[in-house]
Curated annotation (Swiss-Prot):
Its main location: cytoplasm. CDD domains: HisF. It holds the Pfam family His_biosynth. It is found in: Cytoplasm. Heterodimer of HisH and HisF. IGPS catalyzes the conversion of PRFAR and glutamine to IGP, AICAR and glutamate. The HisF subunit catalyzes the cyclization activity that produces IGP and AICAR from PRFAR using the ammonia provided by the HisH subunit. It comes from Cytophaga hutchinsonii (strain ATCC 33406 / DSM 1761 / CIP 103989 / NBRC 15051 / NCIMB 9469 / D465). This is Imidazole glycerol phosphate synthase subunit HisF. Keywords: Amino-acid biosynthesis, Cytoplasm, Histidine biosynthesis, Lyase. Signal peptide: none annotated. Belongs to the HisA/HisF family.
């Protein structure tokens, strides 16, 4: 049986972690690399770095971040944020990233996923899907969740798998930031309609929420940000709690 994964997510803007990090024992509380290294030591299975810097020099900032992360962190990590071409992906993987996350670029040009998986293999291509319920329909949103599309989330998830995504990062915008639990029903529904792993994101607030997303939500991995950044839940305790609930965790 495959083990479940716990993945802290770090949003990076202009080289600093955003979402207000308050680790007192870090020299620079805003340094994503130090924070990532700390999570790695604590037993995180993977890390996701999303660069939300709005600059023209996007690829340059991404690559610099990847190089620094790769030097200091020995667990797999995914980089995302403005990745839209074979060149972007090549630069990030060559700099040391294990996977890349593609979102709006796939919506703009779905064939990009075919190209990327053919060029690099689907094991390193993650498609991020931001979804929100609009009038009873789960619709995909682009541009950091700001622009609604007319794409149905389930149909889009299936299409992305068919085109070569190796993994889906599903963020429920309805749940994001609420700390009221993951979107388990939607996550489970998508999980039963695709065969690739689903990373659930949005809504983590308690350890029980993680139990639920793995059991009810059928997720393969759970991603969270602020509950880890603000030390509300510590990763070692979370993993031992989940193991105690009969959920297979990576040691």
């Amino acid at each position: 049986m495959l083990t479940k994964r716990i993945i802290p997510c770090l949003d990076v803007k202009d080289g600093k972690t955003v979402k207000g990090v308050n680790f007192l024992n870090l020299r620079d509380a805003g340094d994503p690399v130090e924070l990532g290294a700390l999570y790695s030591q604590q037993g995180a299975d993977e890390l996701v770095f999303l660069d939300i810097t709005a600059t023209l020099e996007k690829r340059g900032t991404l690559v610099e971040l990847v190089k620094r992360v790769a030097q200091h962190i020995n667990i797999p990590f995914t980089i995302g944020g403005g990745i839209g071409s074979i060149e972007d992906v090549s630069a990030c993987l060559n700099a040391g990233a294990d996977k890349v996350s593609v979102n709006s670029s796939a919506i703009k040009n779905p064939a990009l996923i075919d190209q990327l998986s053919k060029e690099f293999g689907n094991q390193c291509i993650v498609v991020a899907i931001d979804t929100r319920n609009v009038g009873g329909m789960n619709l995909v949103h682009s541009h950091g969740g700001t622009k609604p599309t007319d794409l149905d989330t389930i149909a889009w998830a299936k299409e992305m798998q068919e085109r070569g995504a190796g993994e889906l990062l599903l963020t429920s915008m309805d749940k994001d930031g609420t700390k009221a639990g993951f979107a388990n029903e939607l996550t489970a529904y998508i999980s039963t309609h695709v065969s690739i792993p689903i990373i659930a994101s949005g809504g983590a607030g308690t350890m029980e929420h993680f139990t639920d997303v793995f059991t009810l939500g059928k997720a393969d991995a759970a991603l969270a940000a602020s509950i880890f950044h603000f030390k509300e839940i510590a990763i070692p305790e979370l993993k031992s709690y989940l193991s105690g609930k009969g959920i297979h965790m990576r040691k």
